[in-house]
């Protein structure tokens, strides 16, 4: 009887130890995934900031295009030309799929440097060196990317009593975490005053 009791107690101790070990492993994995998602979120925020500098300035980069916004044509889709890369007109999903993922996923997944339609972090602000990346360690695996979409909302015809006219742009940015599959997409709307003479 005593032997059975001892074996039962040892079994209970082993089960409790196994469950505790599993909980610790799951907690550590959860913390790692959360850190990875937070890294991707912060990278997407940085891309939004870079796009805002791209649109509004101050920007002293040789590739800067602050004065071009409002003047660039905004047709359907996104531009892949070097000087207006990442600038888009109206983006619409296919008639059968109305999700935002269907609009932006093909744009951000294109890695071909000659046909890509997104702007990379620092491409037009000369801040590339401000965002280190690494395939190992605690840095994002890729630099964040963004597209700037000309909003259909127009505020160019506002009277002086209401306020100054401005153009509105929708920025969509994607940030990557420590793993390429960890991605966070953020959007923001920027309004840029239109110069009036």
Regions found by a protein language model. Name each.
Residues 1-6, 10-197:
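Terminal alpha-helical segments
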């Amino acid at each position: 009887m005593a032997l059975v009791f001892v074996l039962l107690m040892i079994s209970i101790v082993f089960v409790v130890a196994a469950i505790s070990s599993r909980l610790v492993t799951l907690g550590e994995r959860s913390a790692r995934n959360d850190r990875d998602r937070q890294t991707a979120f912060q990278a997407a925020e940085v891309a939004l900031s870079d796009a805002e500098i791209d649109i509004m300035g101050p920007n002293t980069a040789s590739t800067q295009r602050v004065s071009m916004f409002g003047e660039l044509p905004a047709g359907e889709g996104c531009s892949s030309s070097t000087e207006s890369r990442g600038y888009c007109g109206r983006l619409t999903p296919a008639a059968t799929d109305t999700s935002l993922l269907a609009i932006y996923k093909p744009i951000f997944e294109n890695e071909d440097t000659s046909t890509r339609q997104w702007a990379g972090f620092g491409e037009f602000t000369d801040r590339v060196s401000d965002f280190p990346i690494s395939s190992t360690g605690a840095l994002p695996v890729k630099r964040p990317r963004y597209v700037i979409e000309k909003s259909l909302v127009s505020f160019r015809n506002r009277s002086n009593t209401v306020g100054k006219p401005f153009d509105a742009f929708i920025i969509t940015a994607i940030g990557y975490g420590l793993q390429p599959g960890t991605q966070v997409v953020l959007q923001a709307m920027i309004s840029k005053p239109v110069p009036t003479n």
